[in-house]
């Protein structure tokens, strides 16, 4: 699908700062392994939550604000992937699907 940029596990592990005594969400989050069969993988996934990045700042610009929010996706990933995986927020219950263009 041309509108999606799919993330592979090795792509987003670059956002994760690992430590020996901690497990981060970025180490546990599920990924799509076959871009051509992403819909089948999504159906079979055990994830409760699916992340899709949508870079836009239309609302901000429409309200005469300062644009630039479309760049926030990478900052979000950098922060989100480094949250600790724990009993309340389990990384394996999340699937990072893609960035929507």
Regions found by a protein language model. Name each.
Residues 2-101:
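Metal-dependent C-N hydrolase catalytic cores
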